[in-house]
């Protein structure tokens, strides 16, 4: 119940922040992280926010700056795909949402994880500051590729994606094709997988 309530509060805060400013997101393909970071630096309010897998980075931007950024990506030899979202997530545009969510988390009195849980903000296991890390993920970049590589380096060889779709399985496969990925959209799918998958 506490977890579900926090998920709802997080969504509310992010929605409020998204409505406060006209922002947008786009996926940048075929460019290196350094190239995308350099392009973003040429704009006052364009930020690299999701480092998904090799050759795929998402940016958040002030809506009025996005057209020029898309043109810059094309000129640099990359490809940019505008995303159908209403908000510049995982960026400074979400700073107020992060602050508000931190208060909710503090009130919930969370404990540190009993097993290693990797934070996408740092690509490292959570430490003692669970509140700061969870809140900070709202307005900081998602280091998904680095997180996957860190888990593989720590010994993970099998990844399970729970929920609709196989997006994360695809990103993991593009990051390291040697690991196994499985997706379970329904409870019965998960139960079947647990019978078939050998633990890492």
Identify the role of each PLM range.
Residues 106-200:
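Acyltransferase/transacylase module recognition
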């Amino acid at each position: 119940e506490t977890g579900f309530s926090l998920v709802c509060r997080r969504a509310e805060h992010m929605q409020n922040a998204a409505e406060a400013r006209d922002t947008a997101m786009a996926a940048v393909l075929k460019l290196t992280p350094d190239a995308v970071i350099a392009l973003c630096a040429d704009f006052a309010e364009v930020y690299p926010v999701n480092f998904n897998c090799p050759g795929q980075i998402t940016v958040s931007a002030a809506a009025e700056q996005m057209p020029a950024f898309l043109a810059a990506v094309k000129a640099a030899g990359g490809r940019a795909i505008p995303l159908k979202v209403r908000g510049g997530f995982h960026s400074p545009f979400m700073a107020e949402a992060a602050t508000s969510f931190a208060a909710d988390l503090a009130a919930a009195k969370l404990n540190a994880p009993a097993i290693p849980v990797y934070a996408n903000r740092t690509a490292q296991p959570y430490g003692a500051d669970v509140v700061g890390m969870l809140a900070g993920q709202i307005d900081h970049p998602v280091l998904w590729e680095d997180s996957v590589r860190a888990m593989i380096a720590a010994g993970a060889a099998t990844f399970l994606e729970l929920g609709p779709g196989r997006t994360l399985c695809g990103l993991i496969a593009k990051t390291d094709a040697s690991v196994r990925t499985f997706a379970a959209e329904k409870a019965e799918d998960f139960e079947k997988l647990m019978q078939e998958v050998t633990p890492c």
